[in-house]
Amino acid sequence: MITNPSNFRDLHDCYDFIEAGHLYRSALPRNLTKQDWDKLYNLGIRYIIDFRSEFERKEDSYECDQRFQHYNWSALKPETGIDDFYFPRLITKKSTKEEVYNSAWFIRKGYKIMPFDNLAYKQLFQLIKEKDGILFHCGSGKD
């Protein structure tokens, strides 16, 4: 059982039409030990895809084991094209009700448009054609 990174799962367990051992989802793989990376490698994973924004990656970075091909493909770009979705920065303890409401609206809208004409997803779908395993992640591995 993989416990680090958190929220790790084989998507075949959720969707049986996905080939087992080919597509995995998790939270960001930070603070992984060599043994953690070995477990991922032994599962056949060879690609790590980070769907977080550039800002998120700068705020919370990690070093990817060199055995893996690592891609940074931001999945959430609002209609403006600005790669700027970092929830902890959108809402703080000092946020007003209006700021919280506006941030929630931004997030809902972002998730409505995210699946359509998304370059990051197109790149993932191209990579799925490869036979090696793929682990993709955002910050928490929940969306």
Question: Predicted regions span which residues?
Answer:
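Cys-dependent protein tyrosine phosphatase-like superfamily
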Residues: 1-135
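Cytochrome P450 heme-iron axial ligand motif
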Residues: 135, 140-143
